[in-house]
């Protein structure tokens, strides 16, 4: 899925897909979210904030080997304003390589939504100043509050068979396709 909001979209996807799949969903998430103890059992952490734990890669492999449906945001960060347009950053190839490795189909999801201008301006200022830490991430809780009582649209695409990701393109090219 795309990741326009950085919080509410993930919670909404988990709720909708969790109901449909009897709770058999897991999120591939920023390791910082492991500090939210109520959410942690549903999460497979990916290092974004510090040194990589030796257990994280094993947890990712176990998650993909399980019967759980994996919710992931291939850009790795929530959407940013680029050239005046709100869009995801470049998607990483992980969802393609894991689809091939584990023979899992990919179901594309599109979540319609946006954060405040403050959020996007802060993210762009930090990028322009060369600040590597994702300061904008610290404001995602505020963004959730700003978006309460709003309605969002989720579009669920047709499953893409894992066999689609053949050798005519690299996994990185498939991710951008």
Residue ranges and their predicted role:
Residues 1-51:
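Catalytic core of membrane glycerolipid acyltransferases/transacylases, capturing the structured
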Residues 54-177:
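Non-catalytic C-terminal accessory region of glycerolipid acyltransferases
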């Amino acid at each position: 899925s795309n990741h326009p909001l950085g919080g509410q979209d993930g919670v909404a996807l988990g709720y909708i897909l969790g109901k449909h799949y009897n709770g058999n969903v897991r999120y591939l998430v920023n390791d910082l979210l492991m500090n939210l103890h109520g959410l942690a059992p549903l999460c497979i952490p990916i290092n974004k904030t510090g040194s990589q734990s030796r257990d994280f890669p094993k947890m990712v492999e176990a998650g993909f080997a399980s019967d759980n449906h994996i919710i992931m945001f291939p850009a790795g960060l929530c959407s940013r304003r680029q050239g005046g347009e709100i869009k995801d950053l470049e998607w990483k190839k992980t969802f393609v390589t894991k689809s091939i490795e584990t023979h899992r189909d990919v179901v594309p999801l599109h979540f319609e939504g946006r954060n405040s201008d403050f959020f996007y301006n802060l993210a762009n200022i930090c990028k322009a100043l060369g600040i590597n830490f994702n300061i904008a991430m610290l404001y995602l809780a505020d963004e959730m509050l700003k978006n309460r009582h709003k309605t969002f649209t989720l579009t669920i695409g047709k499953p893409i068979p894992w066999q689609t990701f053949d050798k005519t393109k690299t996994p990185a090219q498939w991710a951008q396709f």
